[in-house]
Amino acid sequence: KLLQWQRPAKRWVLKTPHHLEFLPLAKKYFGEVQFIWTHRDVEECIPSFLSMVSYARILFSKEVEQKDVAKHWVRKNGFMLEKALNYRAKNSAKTLFTDISYKALINDSISAIEQIYADRGESISPELKAVFQKSNKENPKGKYGVHQYKLADFGIDEAYIQQFTKEYEQFQQNLDFLLGHYLSH
């Protein structure tokens, strides 16, 4: 609110997993908040996240112990998911959350975006749709290369991740069943 006091924004877009543990505060201080939750396979996104964190740490450290990065951030991600799921269980209004799979967003982004707007009682103008289509065409996945990483780089495996994400993975399976194509692309 401080950042926008002179020029109020129509809409804020906050895109980081760190917001997952602070959903009640977002609702309290921003009132008409709406959460768009893009769901990813945790065994795919957590190693990507660990790689990103490791590269960021290299900027400020002579040595980065990737096993330590993994131990901290896998637990932290599990904690954030748990906090978000607990909040969601108490505040499950359809107007508060829209669930979209990351794969659907990548494979059919226009349909996913149209669903996000529809859940808000809005629609995409033909002009905005054209902007999205142009952006998709000009920026295909992998345009700037591929980010490569493996769980083994961090001294962990899928079973280690699942210790901290079981509840979320079950939630995701239920969503896939309930929402069909929005989560299965």
Give residue ranges: language-model regions.
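PAPS-dependent sulfotransferases, especially Golgi type II membrane carbohydrate sulfotransferases
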Residues: 3-12, 49-185
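Flexible loop/turn segments at secondary-structure boundaries
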Residues: 19-24, 43-46, 106-109
